Amino acid sequence: MDLKGKKVLVFGAGKSGIGAADLLESAGAQPVIYDGNADLDKEAVLHKTNGKYTPEIWAGDFPERALDSLDLVVLSPGVPTDLPLVKSFYEKGLPVWSEVELAYRTGKGEVLAITGTNGKTTTTALLGKIMGDARESVFVVGNIGTAYTSKSLEMSEDSVTVAEISSFQLETIDQFRPKVSAILNITEDHLNRHHTMEEYIRVKELITKNQGPEDVCVLNYEDEVLRKFGENIVPKVVYFSSLRKLDQGIYLDGDQIMLKTEKEEIPIVKTEELKILGRHNHENVMAAAAMAYYAGVSVESIRKSVCEFVAVPHRIEYVTEKNGVAYYNDSKGTNPDAAIKGIQAMNRPTLLIGGGYDKESSYDEWIESFDGKVRYLVLIGQTKEKIKAAAERLGFTDIILCEDLKEAVRVCAEKANPGDAVLLSPACASWGQFDNYEQRGDMFKEYVKAL
């Protein structure tokens, strides 16, 4: 679609929506920003645009008569596709795009795209480093922090875009086609948005929707859903595994990550050379290395980059040691599966801070993973009573309830012995007490340093 002169509704007045509106204006379209919040501060929204134009801003009830004037709708990631208003767009025959689709349509060059329940940000950051070390023009975008829409007009045919893509963004893609895609894993998450696990899986798998036989999809062999999915898709499938050798793919053999192609078996790196902890991070390295290899990067360059890579903030991030107690920030552990990986990475008796916003998750597997390693479970947030009840039902009773994160850090410092670890890995979203998981992690680090 040629966007020039088109009237485009941007649904959502947050960071993503404003970024999409800025891009649309730069591409010659006429963006209209809409938000369902009747009390929206329109002046504040205007101040957040790039300042080169003055978009129309609609707030509150949607003016139904305006439907006929629209050519396209761009949904922000936080807008559910099952809203009656969104359904009316489809019924009217309007194209409905995600911001990812908009950025892809206006960008150039190759796209390497990563999705999955957990590990996306670390894998995206690592792949971004590998590609950045090997290529001239590389953009690392998406949920990792830089909006895809803010960079697409800077891209050339020689550019490489490394994109972290969420399930929310995949719901409304149309032509989005990565040269290399990866689905790292699929575990229970966002059921408050997708309602069923089957729907969540379907949306994640859309990342391969437009890939052809010359494209590549990297999948986790140890995820049964993904292993079966890989049997019936168009792109070339490359599996990774941390538990077994593969006939073809990338896998962990003892402490050595190996890549096996149709022609040869290539050592990539030893796990002891890596600066990031845990088996889940070995899987992230395998996924990023496979993607880079099939994007044309040499093994030598991949090896150098992965050895230099350090953990991104809020992912089992070492904060400090005080009185013999090590403090780790894993605020990105926003669901039980991610939080399990945080516990698995600990090699000390652990005081675990958990709880937060309820995404309708089950916490049983997370609690069962404590396996003698967790000394105390210190709970905060909306889910603290729900998690306490689940833990007691499963026989774990060393539980302390706190009003907030500051109190939880203080209690952990009082209870911890030299040689212990204090781990913030909440298994829940941050909403309600914090704006996002980054703010939660930053506050944890502040409270720890103030002890």
Where are these regions (language model features)?
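N-terminal leader/targeting and accessory segments in enzymes
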Residues: 1-98, 102
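Nucleotide phosphate-binding/pyrophosphate-handling subdomain across enzymes
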Residues: 2-7, 17-27, 271-374
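Short internal beta-strands
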Residues: 31-37, 217-221, 353-354, 373-382
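C-terminal helical cap/extension that packs against the catalytic core
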Residues: 43-55, 364-420
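Walker A (P-loop) phosphate-binding motif
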Residues: 99-141
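Flexible active-site lid/hinge loop adjacent to a nucleotide/diphosphate
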Residues: 155-246, 251-253, 258, 265, ...
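Beta-strand->loop->alpha-helix junctions that form or flank phosphate-binding loops
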Residues: 60-61, 97-101, 234-252, 303-307, ...
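Residue-level signal for inorganic ion chemistry
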Residues: 12, 24, 73, 114, ...
